[in-house]
Amino acid sequence: METITIGSTGPLTGGAASYGISVKQGAEIAIEEINNAGGVKVGDKSYNLALQFEDDEADEEKARTAYSTLMDKKVDVIMGAVTSGSSLAITDLTKADNILQLTPSGSAAAITANDNVFRLCFTDPIQGKTIADYIIKQGYDSVAVLYNNSDEYSTGVYEAFKNELIETGNPELLVAEESFVSDDVDFTAQLTKIKATDAKIIFVPAYYEAAAYIAKQVKDLGLEVEIVGSDGWDGVLGQVTDTSVLDGVVFLTPFYPTDPSEKVQNFVKTYKAKYNNAIPDQFAADSYDSVYVLKAAFEKAGTKDTADLIKAMTEISVDGLTGQISFDVSGDPIKEAKFVVIENGAYQTKDID
């Protein structure tokens, strides 16, 4: 049987390695399942899937080099990059090479500007808007924001959040805007300023490494405040030794491993068995779903031609781990967001009244 090769680039080493490893492992499980079930039927031919994954260390220049390596190896589609900066770094390259690009986890709005690029995860604007609407709906009268102004993801979510407060006529809810930069671990100065405002809730659009430090320091400084996070908080439980510092934290996510659905629990069981009892995160789930989306696109197109694949991407609907997935004409996903709350060291569904 011939092979369709999925080319992927993401961090397997460096500070963001956990994201790339999750994406690689989620894809490997999906590919194994698909191949065991007979592969991908494209027209009247069946193909096995294979994954070629290159390490980009979440670095834009290294992402371009990794992409070049993938093209030299004659991959059929690109599933990447993992991070927003690296995804943006290769979009014009994939456009010039006329190859379909699907990022499982790059959330910056500009990534899907080219018609050959799609994304599986939520966009930054959707996250910011959804979390602002949550805060308004829950009746909080004051909110502080602590975001990473050196990171495109964090800044993008923050800006969309602020814009939604303005557009809904609630700008007065935002009583403090504090920032930090990547690799910061001491947030005392920012949190002390926030404490002085008596904000009832802090919104932290950030990845889980910084999020863990912030949550602990909120407790250490005695802030009596709720915390809400973006999807970058997924995995934060693995960053703390005392999970009680995270009790009550709410964050937006497309996936959580304690979801009781049969589909999710089967995936979690397989993932743990294959990867030394590791618990899958949303990056693994988005990647798993991305492989099934690509399978559906090839089968809908009936050909490996890029133009036909692009058309097929806007016509398919896939029942994934992260929900029912389809795509709009701009390449962004249409699927439902979920909120989870951390309680007693576990992720639980957050009911939104």
Question: Residues of each region from the PLM?
Answer:
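Signal peptide-proximal N-terminal region
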Residues: 4, 25-51, 166-172
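Extracellular/periplasmic periplasmic-binding protein-like sensory domains
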Residues: 215-288, 341-353
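Extracellular/periplasmic bilobed ligand-binding domains
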Residues: 157-252
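An alpha-beta-alpha
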Residues: 117-178, 201, 294
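Periplasmic-binding protein-like
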Residues: 70-82, 102-104, 144-147, 198-208, ...
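Segments of small-molecule ligand-sensing domains
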Residues: 273-284, 295-346
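Beta-alpha junction/loop-to-helix N-cap segments that form part of ligand/metal-binding clefts
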Residues: 19-22, 40-111, 120, 180-184, ...
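Extracytoplasmic "Venus flytrap"
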Residues: 7-28, 54-60, 83-85, 146-155, ...
